Design a protein with these regions (language model features):
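A composition-biased, non-transmembrane "mature-region" signal
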Residues: 1-149
């Protein structure tokens, strides 16, 4: 794995894992949906230029994260790019989203001094790890893309 792969979050399957068909990979990614996950995986619209899209909305933070995925059967890889919108600051970011989003509140403590408390928190790995795991278990490469699919 090279430095660019590390920066983009590209992961390769374990050696010896047989690559499945594109239909099986699509089914595995759609099977990630469920009541215990904080996002929804759906088929991509033609305007999104993606085969599958995972969308997560965190209302407490005013944050929307979308991962667009394109299946490339010839190379047995899923190309993924993340997009992030913040409602409060109207910021938009595209590329590979990593880290944790937090909301902090400053209030006075019982002793009268300022106190910082964490209000809401969202770890982007909670969205990407199940998707990446489904792709790697199918024997395909998860290739993070920076600019476009």
């Amino acid at each position: 794995m090279g430095i660019f792969d590390k920066l983009t979050g590209t992961r390769y399957p374990e050696t010896g894992v047989a690559a499945r068909s594109a239909a099986e990979v699509r089914a595995a990614l759609l099977a990630v949906n469920g009541p215990g996950v904080p996002f929804v995986v759906r088929n991509g619209a033609p305007s999104e230029r993606a085969d599958l899209v995972a969308v997560c909305r965190v209302r407490e933070l005013g944050l929307t994260v979308r991962t667009r995925m394109r299946l490339v059967p010839e190379q047995h890889e899923v190309r993924a790019i993340d997009e992030q919108w913040e409602a409060q600051t109207r910021e938009y970011a595209r590329g590979q989203v990593t880290g944790v989003a937090r909301d902090w509140t400053i209030e006075r403590g019982t002793d009268g001094r300022p106190q910082i408390t964490e209000g809401a928190r969202f770890d982007f790995a909670a969205m990407k790890n199940p998707l990446r795991g489904a792709v790697l278990d199918a024997g395909w490469t998860w290739r993070g893309v920076v600019f476009r699919l």
